[in-house]
Amino acid sequence: MGYNCINKKDLSGKVFTIPTNDANPYIKLHANINKPITAMTMCQRFNSGLERGQTLFSLATKSADNELMLYKSSLGTYRVHVRLRSLDFFNLPDGINEWISLCWTWDSKTGLTQLWLNGKRSARRVISPHGTITGEPSIVLGQDQDTYGGGFDPNQSFVGDVTDVHFWDKVLSPCDIKYYMHGQIKSPGNLLNWEALQFTTNGKVFIEKSDFIC
């Protein structure tokens, strides 16, 4: 089943469901990016029963596949990629078959990056200081792009539900992130906004009702 939403669609109260474990299903997000990215926050909620590694967010350009990539390596262990560099976060609050509210921040000025899971934050780390992400981005949910818009590996695919995806060109304040963790949005993402999302899907991707807040 495929969706091709050229006009912006409000997905409030909805989830993308990816039920199969292969390299075919994914969601392509069309972002409002018209200048280099020098800081960012990406937030999403996901629910998965997998224990193996899986890709949560992939942004590639024609010059680099892992410009921005978030990978859940195992329960409580997450790997972030920025400008082809990577680092791991360990012992994060996590779960199987339950909703995880996640935010990831990065600021190129300092290189500081941080993860938030269910209201608790990691220690700040440094990756790719003074880096800049330029070029037309390809943003995918559900798969890791090893090439621009493709090169998917089924062993890195996401299986489960994902919702409330927002992407900003700044580092959100801790208070704004805590609002998100509790199901509220002070200001929707200016690069990707779940309440006005342009997207296309491939393979078995379904839009279902969310049970995050009932």
Summary of predicted features, one role per range:
Residues 1-214:
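Extracellular glycan-associated modules
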